Design a protein with these regions (language model features):
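Short internal beta-strands
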Residues: 1-4
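Short active-site-adjacent helix-start/loop capping segments
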Residues: 6-9, 126-127
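Catalytic core of the metallo-beta-lactamase
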Residues: 8-77, 104-105
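Cap/insert and terminal regions of metallo-dependent hydrolase folds
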Residues: 64-141
Length: 141
């Protein structure tokens, strides 16, 4: 992967699956989001705070603060600009032909009833998490 190419040492204790490891089982649910031909993102849900934690599945950048107006326009074009942040177009394209798997994963995440969504890229959604999840992943049919 990227870490190896950049000679960054990375070690793993175990592979993440749909079952939470003993260390956080009962507190945090997790799901391997399937459907992409190239990427499997593990999503997490912290039960007590009703918080969904995502890495790349949704990006939501505040483009008004970007110093370069062209960059701001590009982010809007690829649908990762707030307040309508979604799955980046390049990532979304990897789901072509596998929407059924993605839909099943989305349904499981919606069943968790998240109130908040923490994102690795951009502004988080601190309320109405379930509605924001539906909105951002509306491309999954």
């Amino acid at each position: 992967g990227r870490a190896a190419k950049q000679k960054i040492p990375v070690s793993f204790d175990e592979k993440l699956t749909n079952e939470a490891p003993q260390a956080w089982a009962g507190q945090i649910e997790q799901l391997v989001f399937k459907g992409s031909a190239y990427i499997e993102e593990v999503v997490f849900f912290h039960k007590d705070s009703q918080t969904l934690i995502l890495t790349d599945l949704i990006e939501n950048f505040e483009t008004e603060s970007f110093p370069n107006p062209l960059r701001s326009k590009v982010y809007k074009l690829v649908r990762v600009a707030a307040p309508d942040g979604q799955t980046p177009i390049d990532y979304r394209m990897t789901f072509i032909g596998h929407q059924k798997e993605a839909k099943e994963c989305l349904e499981r995440m919606l069943a968790w009833q998240p109130e908040k969504i923490i994102l690795a890229h951009g502004s988080c959604f601190l309320e109405n998490g379930r509605a924001e999840l539906r909105r951002a992943l509306r491309w999954i049919r």
